[in-house]
Amino acid sequence: MEKHILVVDDSPTIRSSVAFCLHNAGYKVTEAEDGQDALEKLESMRESVHNLAMIITDINMPRMDGITFIEHVKKSHFRFLPILVFTTESEKSMIQKGKEAGASGWVVKPFQPEQLLWAVKKLVWA
């Protein structure tokens, strides 16, 4: 079965490049523009929770930031999913907050496709 990943980022460019990279590696991707949009998409996936392999999320987003989104996910029936956090060099201080909220790993932006795929494989196949 194809592994399904939810990608959450307010930048359409980042979402598209991540989706392209993941599609080329054989993953199915659903995109969300912020934490609120992602929660709505997760709710619509409730019946197929076992088809979702992981979540990749940005930290700084409008409406609902990544930390708040992670906290919501970890209190839901999706709590078992690994969550990979995107952060920029200037946001590295947020890594600890992400870990405390329940993130499983992180990738610093800008990233190379190989870095992203290595981090994804490490979490999906763990």
Where are these regions (language model features)?
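A Lys-centered signature of the CheY-like receiver
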Residues: 109
